[in-house]
Amino acid sequence: MRELKILVVNNYGQFCHLIHRTVRDLDMDTKIIPNVTPIEEILAEEPDGLILSGGPEMERAGLCFDYVREIDVPILGICLGHQAIALAYGGHVHAGKKGGYAEIEVEVLEEDDILRGLGPKTTVWASHADEVAILPDGFIHLARSDVCEIEAMRHPTKPIYGVQWHPEVSHTKKGEELLMNFFEVCDLY
């Protein structure tokens, strides 16, 4: 696979720099950008894909809602990024029953583009302080757990994906595989 340009949108989560380092270690050209970067500046970078990082609160998600609706490149939302995608397209997010980080067993419901090779079950590291409660209309439900019904989803027609868990941390089994699957989507788009 060629070297892709992947921009990591900083939503002020504690793992943002780890996402950046993991993407770089997978031989991609990457850069962290503030979540208030104007769309024109992002497009001028000519990215092959965007990763929306996790973060502490939706009120600090900057322009993420605009990014997922208006930028035509593959997008992967992680944790808060996943929730921002859901909200941008009319889904609902609520406080989870189990806050804090924990190891979770996720059931893969559909091994689509980004979850290929991860099923039928995989162990992940996730926080469920907030979680997607209702999928946006038409979105495909990709994974669930006993802690959270909507662990992963994708847009019905665009290459936009969300996962509640953190593929960038070592506690997540097959996290790098998920990222490489996302890069393949970016490469083919």
UniProtKB/Swiss-Prot annotation:
Catalysis performed (reactions): XMP + L-glutamine + ATP + H2O = GMP + L-glutamate + AMP + diphosphate + 2 H(+)
Broadest EC class assigned to this enzyme: ligase
GO molecular function: ATP binding; GMP synthase activity
Pathway: Purine metabolism; GMP biosynthesis; GMP from XMP (L-Gln route): step 1/1
Keyword line: ATP-binding, Glutamine amidotransferase, GMP biosynthesis, Ligase, Nucleotide-binding, Purine biosynthesis
GO annotations of cellular component type: cytosol
PANTHER family in the record: GMP SYNTHASE [GLUTAMINE-HYDROLYZING] (PTHR11922:SF2), GMP SYNTHASE-RELATED (PTHR11922)
Protein name: GMP synthase [glutamine-hydrolyzing] subunit A
Species of provenance: Methanosarcina mazei (strain ATCC BAA-159 / DSM 3647 / Goe1 / Go1 / JCM 11833 / OCM 88)
Lineage of origin: Archaea, Methanobacteriati, Methanobacteriota, Stenosarchaea group, Methanomicrobia
